[in-house]
């Protein structure tokens, strides 16, 4: 199988001009706001024109259609924000971040949100940044009695709220998306197809299973404005984790407790796979591993994907966790 790539810089296809100079391409896809990144390493012998910051790179990777069914799969748009040169041998490394993350999302704001649904809040924030909102059906009507945004960016606020309800939030292709974590949804909120990973596709595997989770229950607190008292909410039974945070209402406190308990459950198993390159795998995608052994066989949700093309071929590395119960 012959790896293939296509790179479009500022809407101009530059694939042929860099084909002979390419040393490697690495694309990292993370769930949530962690930030997707691109690294392109080029030979600089003889010297080429010094690259420019701010270039917009569209990247597609895959295999030759005559030898593999994948073809080229678009991996997104990236803005070059770092250029490195080293040697000998002389090489350039262009590093870029996904263009979806607008800088305005990082600017601090101070305001309060009262009597609003999570869907309406995300929609309002999206509109403020000239984006469209996509919120999972199970999250849209989640009621927020009160939340303060004090010298806090919209990015941090949304990440905080998503964590409280066991969700992930990510800007993709002009959308601001919030969907339940671990439910294998695409960036536009649609269900991702289940991808089967067979033993012959796996170059290396590593699974870690901790002895047992530390906690079987979570207690969170909320402030009752009528009684002026701090009330407790417990989810689960057994060894208890006690949250220090006090939430605005009982509903928010219970959702936060459920999300935290699920986090403890997910941390018991961690899977890493190195695969024959598969450009269709993405963060939050769901895979079914077959042909190995328990507890590796079965369903997993991808948290991180690294695609790499170099002189060794095309490989895909993934980190995954068990799906939501």
Locations of the language-model features?
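Short, basic/aromatic beta-hairpin or loop at an interaction surface
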Residues: 27-38, 253-269
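Glycine-rich, small/acidic residue-mixed loop/short-helix segments
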Residues: 313-325
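Short beta-strand-centered interaction patches in the first periplasmic/extracellular domains
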Residues: 91, 98-100, 135-202
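Amphipathic, non-transmembrane alpha-helical segments in extracytoplasmic/periplasmic proteins
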Residues: 38-40, 96, 110-134, 149-172, ...
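Extracytoplasmic
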Residues: 2-4, 20-22, 33-37, 54-56, ...
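Short, conserved beta-turn/loop elements at beta-strand boundaries and strand-helix junctions
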Residues: 84-88, 304-312
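Acidic, small/polar-enriched beta strand-loop surface segments
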Residues: 1-5, 159, 171-263, 275-308, ...
């Amino acid at each position: 199988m012959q790896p293939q790539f296509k790179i479009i810089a500022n809407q101009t296809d530059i694939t042929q001009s860099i084909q002979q100079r390419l040393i490697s391409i690495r694309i990292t896809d993370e769930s949530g706001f962690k930030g997707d990144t691109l690294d392109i390493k080029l030979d600089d012998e003889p010297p080429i024109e010094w690259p420019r910051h701010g270039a917009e790179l569209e990247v597609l990777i895959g295999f030759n259609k005559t030898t593999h069914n994948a073809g080229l799969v678009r991996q997104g748009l990236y803005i070059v924000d770092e250029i490195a040169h080293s040697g000998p041998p002389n090489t350039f490394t262009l590093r870029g971040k996904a263009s979806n993350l607008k800088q305005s999302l990082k600017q601090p704001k101070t305001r309060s949100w009262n009597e609003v649904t999570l869907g309406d809040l995300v929609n309002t924030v999206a509109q403020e940044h000239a984006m469209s909102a996509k919120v999972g059906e199970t999250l849209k009507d989640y009621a927020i009695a009160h939340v303060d945004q004090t010298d806090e960016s919209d990015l941090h606020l949304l990440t905080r709220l998503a964590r409280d309800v066991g969700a992930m939030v990510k800007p993709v292709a002009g959308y601001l998306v919030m969907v339940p974590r671990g439910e294998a949804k695409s960036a536009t909120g649609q269900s991702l197809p289940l991808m089967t990973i067979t033993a012959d596709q796996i170059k290396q595997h590593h699974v870690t299973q901790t002895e047992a989770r530390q906690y079987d229950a979570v207690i969170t607190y909320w402030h009752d404005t009528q009684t002026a008292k701090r009330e407790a909410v417990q989810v689960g039974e057994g060894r208890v984790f006690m949250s220090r945070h006090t939430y605005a209402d009982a509903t928010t406190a219970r959702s936060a407790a459920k999300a935290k308990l699920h986090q403890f459950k997910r941390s018991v198993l961690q899977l890493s796979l190195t695969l024959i390159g598969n450009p269709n795998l993405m963060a939050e995608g769901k895979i079914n591993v077959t042909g190995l052994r328990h507890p590796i066989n079965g369903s997993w949700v991808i948290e991180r994907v690294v695609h790499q093309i170099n002189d060794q071929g095309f490989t895909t590395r993934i980190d995954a966790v068990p799906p939501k119960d």
